[in-house]
Amino acid sequence: KRCYRTPDLKSQTCPPGEDLCYTKKWCADWCTSRGKVIELGCVATCPKVKPYEQITCCSTDNCNPHPKMKP
C-alpha cells in the first residue's frame, strides 16, 4: 500500500499491516487565519473521530492527496 504522508506530502510505502490511507483535519489555534491542520498517513484501521476532527479513510494507493494537490 502507498499513501501520501505528512509532513513532506510524498507518496510512501506503508508499514506492513497498515493497509488504509487516511486524511485527518482539525482546527488548531490558527484555524481562522491558516485553515485546518491536515495530517496524512497510513493506518491499520480507520481511527475513531473525535468531535473536533474530520477523518476520511480509503483503501486504494495514493487515495489521500492533500486538498491543495488535487487538480
UniProtKB/Swiss-Prot annotation:
Q: List the disulfide bonds.
A: 3-21, 14-42, 27-31, 46-57, 58-63
Q: Which tissues is this protein detected in according to the database? A: Expressed by the venom gland.
Q: Which UniProt keywords apply?
A: Acetylcholine receptor inhibiting toxin, Disulfide bond, Ion channel impairing toxin, Neurotoxin, Postsynaptic neurotoxin, Secreted, Toxin
Q: State one molecular function term (GO).
A: ion channel regulator activity
Q: Give a Gene Ontology cellular component term annotated to this protein.
A: extracellular region
Question: What is its subcellular localisation?
Answer: Secreted
Keyword Disulfide bond included in the entry's annotation: yes
What residue intervals traverse the membrane?
A: none
Q: For this UniProt entry, what is the primary localization, expressed as one broad class?
A: secreted
Output the superkingdom of the source species: Eukaryota
| Similarity comment: family membership | Belongs to the three-finger toxin family. Long-chain subfamily. Type II alpha-neurotoxin sub-subfamily.
Describe its function. Answer: Binds with high affinity to muscular (alpha-1/CHRNA1) and neuronal (alpha-7/CHRNA7) nicotinic acetylcholine receptor (nAChR) and inhibits acetylcholine from binding to the receptor, thereby impairing neuromuscular and neuronal transmission.
* Name the record gives this protein: Long neurotoxin 1
Taxonomic source organism: Naja melanoleuca
Q: What is the lineage of its organism?
A: Eukaryota, Metazoa, Chordata, Craniata, Vertebrata
